[in-house]
């Protein structure tokens, strides 16, 4: 599954006992079964269950809180579970470790063409293997997307790397209510706002850099995106089977 591929990608970068999975509580047993199929049974403490969905910022903040307890100097790498990413990206991700010590790193994808389904990143001044982020752009129309591609913008992949310290500092600075909620012994998760990490933190922080990835990447969050990359039969149909057909 896409989730299993994402988990294996994480295992290629960290020991299983340093991997946290955040999911809605209604998916917890499915997640546990899928990880067990890979031969990596997940400890209960490594599975964080959201009682309600509150978008990506509270989910990442929840994980960062647990990671900080174990290792206040840890680096946090965030992978969505519905992406396809070529294995060559692993080395490029590792190249961002130094930048992530003092910055929020977002990984940008060099566009294969104008795409209206992704947000865009305007790279600024070069810094190490990446660039200081000049601006984030929302999903554009096709003409605007073509202009972004001509001007060297990157697709916003939704993958991030940062130190838990820097994340906590920026969360306290820009979203103090969310930061305060996670200082409580038992955070009141349902009371948190629904907020993406892009909108709630990255677009307002001045400590954001982007590192371009040259690997093949696709956000497979829709059936249309899956159809684009899947093998098709002579009639243009796509079939994925688990069993006898």
Task: Indicate where each model-derived feature is located.
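Conserved N-terminal catalytic core of the sugar/cofactor nucleotidyltransferase
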Residues: 1-78, 84-90, 94
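Residue-level signal for inorganic ion chemistry
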Residues: 3, 63, 82, 121, ...
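Structural motif
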Residues: 19-20, 46, 75-77, 103-106, ...
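A conserved hydrophobic position in a structured secondary element of the catalytic/binding core
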Residues: 23, 79, 140, 162, ...
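Cofactor-binding loop segments of dinucleotide-utilizing enzymes, especially the Rossmann-like FAD-
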Residues: 24, 81, 109, 213
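Left-handed beta-helix
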Residues: 162-245
């Amino acid at each position: 599954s896409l989730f299993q591929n994402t988990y294996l990608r994480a295992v290629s970068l960290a020991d299983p006992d340093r991997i946290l999975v955040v999911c809605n509580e209604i998916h917890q047993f499915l997640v546990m079964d899928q990880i067990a199929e890979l031969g990596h049974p997940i400890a209960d403490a490594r599975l964080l269950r959201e009682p309600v969905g509150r978008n990506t910022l509270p989910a990442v903040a929840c994980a960062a809180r647990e990671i900080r307890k174990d290792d206040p100097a840890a680096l946090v790498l965030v992978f969505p579970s519905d992406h396809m990413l070529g294995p060559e990206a692993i080395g490029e991700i590792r190249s961002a470790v130094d930048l992530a010590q003092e910055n929020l790193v977002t990984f940008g994808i060099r566009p294969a063409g104008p795409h209206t389904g992704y947000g865009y990143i305007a790279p600024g001044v070069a810094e190490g293997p990446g660039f200081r982020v000049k601006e984030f752009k929302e999903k554009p129309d096709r003409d605007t997307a073509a202009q972004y591609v001509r001007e060297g913008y990157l697709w916003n992949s939704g993958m991030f790397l940062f130190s838990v310290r820097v994340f906590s500092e920026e969360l306290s600075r820009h979203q103090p209510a969310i930061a305060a909620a996670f200082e409580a012994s038992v955070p009141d998760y349902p009371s948190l706002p629904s907020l993406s990490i892009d909108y709630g933190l990255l677009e307002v922080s001045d400590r954001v850099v982007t590192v371009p990835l040259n690997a093949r990447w696709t956000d497979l969050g829709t059936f249309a995106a899956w159809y684009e990359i899947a093998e098709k039969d002579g009639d243009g149909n796509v079939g994925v089977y688990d069993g006898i057909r």
